[in-house]
């Protein structure tokens, strides 16, 4: 029994087997748990609509031919938001880890998927941050009602009314921005001039994929933030907790950044070659999976009976999860599994057969941080780039340590794990060895 109802928990060895059952997708589970058929919860119910295809298309677009433009947007906006959140104060000053991390991640995610105009719109950033929080409260309150009464209850519950208002306002903001772009294009064409502006962002990709088919722009954008902001914020927080105050590790990360930027310049190639940083993030994710529970590396709902190889059956319409505890309690898989070893996966890359699976964005039954199979996190390559670009700015430009008395305990909420939401970090400006804010090369 979990906080959201009965579920079957399967052992880790079933991970590869369940991968074969791709028709048993996560959409069923998400819609059921978050009342996707009730007004206000529309971003949780995009599974059978064009919005889901739009979200997946944008995720692929962000790490394909548009990756260079994505890197440019991430770097430009990282410089802005890091300076805004961390300041240029050379003296130690406290910052609240969660509020700082979520603001930075929401800003960068919007820069790529909603465009520069919306990423610098504080109202839009507030909505993308608050929507998931409101949804969690509203969903929990609706769980207390009988299923048949939930739609009616949502009409008067303040949290549900607020949720609907946030979706409506999101649609208005995105539609207004998209319409302004269309008007600009029309005016350019009427003037007989060639259209020269290409935005290389999610708003453009949505129109490109939809090809005139109707869709809900605000719902689509909120669906993106549901999968991108909270989980990535949580990952960034845990990484900062794990490296803060570790001077030897910070120095090693800085040496790697400086060496590769000096050789390749500040480009997307730099990000690919940051192998120690890549390993460090993956190790942090191993010990504290992001956005998933201690027992839920993979979450599915059976669309039909699933017959397992040992004779076991997962009945139709029953939610099930696969334990990921082997990631931190299996010493045969990961020697000294409870210790944080930043170079663990860097060393694992040298082992034949692990050259690819040891990379941050790779999928493996041994590391379920992103899930597994066709329904694994489609935005993992973008998240890897986003977090690395941001960390380059944060590590090169600032010293970090935990506030005295802060032990950054992982919090458990039902079957979920969360980086300490009350932790405080101390930060001070330092002079970076290479410039990350100049013209990109």
From Swiss-Prot:
Q: Which InterPro entries match?
A: Cyt_P450, Cyt_P450_sf
Molecular function as annotated in GO: heme binding; iron ion binding; monooxygenase activity; oxidoreductase activity, acting on paired donors, with incorporation or reduction of molecular oxygen
User: Sorted alphabetically, which Gene3D superfamilies does this protein's record hold?
Assistant: Cytochrome P450
Q: Name one GO biological process term.
A: secondary metabolic process
Q: In which pathway does it act?
A: Alkaloid biosynthesis
Here the segments flagged for biased composition (Polar residues) are 186-195
The record's section on SUPFAM superfamilies has: Cytochrome P450
Q: Which cofactor does it need?
A: heme
Q: Region (Disordered) spans which residues?
A: 175-195
Catalytic activity, as annotated: campesine D + reduced [NADPH--hemoprotein reductase] + O2 = campesine G + oxidized [NADPH--hemoprotein reductase] + 2 H2O + H(+)
Entry keyword set = Alkaloid metabolism, Heme, Iron, Metal-binding, Monooxygenase, Oxidoreductase
E.C. code: 1.-.-.-
Q: Kindly list the positions annotated as binding heme.
A: 377
User: What's this one used for in biotech?
Assistant: Campesine G features good insecticidal activity against the global honeybee pest Galleria mellonella, which supports its future application in the development of biopesticides.
Q: Where is the signal peptide?
A: none
What highest taxon heads this organism's lineage? Eukaryota
The UniProt family comment states:
Belongs to the cytochrome P450 family.
Family annotation (PANTHER family): CYTOCHROME P450, CYTOCHROME P450 MONOOXYGENASE AUSG-RELATED
Q: What does this protein do?
A: Cytochrome P450 monooxygenase; part of the gene cluster that mediates the biosynthesis of campesine G, a dimeric indole piperazine alkaloid that shows good insecticidal activity Galleria mellonella. Within the pathway, cpsC catalyzes regioselective dehydrogenation reaction towards C2-N1 of the (2H)-indole ring of campesine D to yield the final product, campesine G. The non-canonical non-ribosomal peptide synthetase cpsA catalyzes the first steps of the pathway by producing L-tryptophanal and L-valinal from their respective amino-acids.
Q: Specify the protein name.
A: Cytochrome P450 monooxygenase cpsC
* Organism this protein belongs to: Aspergillus campestris (strain IBT 28561)
Gene that produces this protein: cpsC
